[in-house]
Amino acid sequence: MKLAEKLGVETVVTVGAFITGRIAEHPQVYGAASELVLVKELEELGVKIIDSGAVTWMNGLIPGLAKVRNLKGLFLSGETSGFMIDPRAAMIILRVLVKKLGLQIDMTELEGQAKEIETALKQSSDKDSGSSGSSEYIG
């Protein structure tokens, strides 16, 4: 935090995974912030605010320490199953950050990886639903 202050940082951001244990068709970004103004900004960006429980580990600690040092702090997490590397979760977080910070980022490669995973998941799902066959006992 001392370095952030020295460099004139105003807002400290942490990112992480919001693990649900299931594959979401349309994953969401969840977040929390140290100030009500930031909470409202996140809501305007389509972020679902975490309003119960606690943000744990460094994702909660760092924004909390930022507030103690009179810096703004926020946490963003991308919804993911937790079963695999999930470029979709990274991509949806980046989209929020791009809007919030007014950045331009080439996400072509990340989008390609996300599409590959979506295709693989769809093929797996199609295979599972297509293999129901007969469930008669053969014993």
Language-model-detected regions and their locations in the chain:
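Short His-Asn-centered micro-motif
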Residues: 15-16
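Accessory terminal and edge-of-domain segments that mediate assembly/interaction
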Residues: 1-7, 21-139
